[in-house]
Amino acid sequence: MTLERTGRDEEKALTQPPSGHSSVQAGKVGVLLVNLGTPDGTDYWPMRRYLGEFLSDRRVIEWPRAVWYPILYGIILARRPKKSGALYAKIWNREQNESPLRTFTRAQGQKLATALADKENVIVDWAMRYGSPSIETVTKSLIERGCDRIVMFPLYPQYSATTTATVNDKFFEALIEMRHQPAVRTVPAYPEEPVYIDALVRSIERHLATLDFEPEVVVASYHGIPQSYARRGDPYYEQCLATTARVRERLGWDEKKLITTFQSRFGPEEWLQPYTDKTVEQLARDGVRSIAVINPGFVSDCLETLEEIAVEADRTFREAGGKNFTHIPCLNDSDEGMAVIESLIRREMSGWA
């Protein structure tokens, strides 16, 4: 009798947590959408915090810290927050007091959650690489809500160490201190995925159908990276060209109708070329009167698309003699854009949900 009771007691001890031990929820799959980031406001200090975090990332600026930090903290962060804040103020979502990137990313998360309603064990959330909500905060929140598996989706169609890799880095950093880590998967870049190319083609066709002019040239403008990064093995340049080529094939256009350029260069280094601003200016000087610009590498409209392209590139083109300019919006939370996100997430969740 004593031995039987002892055996039952030992079995009970193995199946029940120790006294005071917190219960562990399990069985859910977290989906984490991550975009680049946004300041919390347009004033000096919110901009300085955001720019400081962004520009101190070793994946973004690969210069030796002894060279870069005096420039960053001594010059750039003293001057650039005011200038950048003024630019953000032009596109700021004043109704929700946030940048459009945050508005669109939240909407993508909400719509994805609705689309995945058939998966009862899935929780969808979103985060930013720089600024808030942070990857660490949201990752911990998913785990606290019972997720023992997480699919993390860096929202960058083309891979670069400056974007996809640094999001992966930050996500893995969030796991380092955890004793009980979740199983994880990361969604790879998708520069030639049929669902993505189809979404871009539909977006282009729909937008051009609303115009009262026919663009002579359509410019596919991607965010640039320093040429030195590409020489050291970053595949971004080739993947951008591949995306443009697939879109061009689907539309039946030639290489003069749809061209690839790169924008947003920063600092003294040579970046990927041709540069967008110089290209639209030269097109106008060469007699082209009507163009359209699309940003295939941006999942959501943001400062670089709404201000740098829709405003500045438009002005540059017209001042050089151009007449008609249109910016084709990013996929954002459109039906086509959400089809891309949902399709890739369902594929990567295979076997989990």
From Swiss-Prot:
SUPFAM superfamilies: Chelatase
EC number: 4.98.1.1
Region listing for Disordered, in residue ranges: 1-23
GO cellular component: cytoplasm
GO terms, biological process: heme biosynthetic process
Binding-site residues for Fe cation, renumbered to this chain: 223, 304
Family label: Belongs to the ferrochelatase family.
Record's protein name: Ferrochelatase
Gene assigned in the entry: hemH
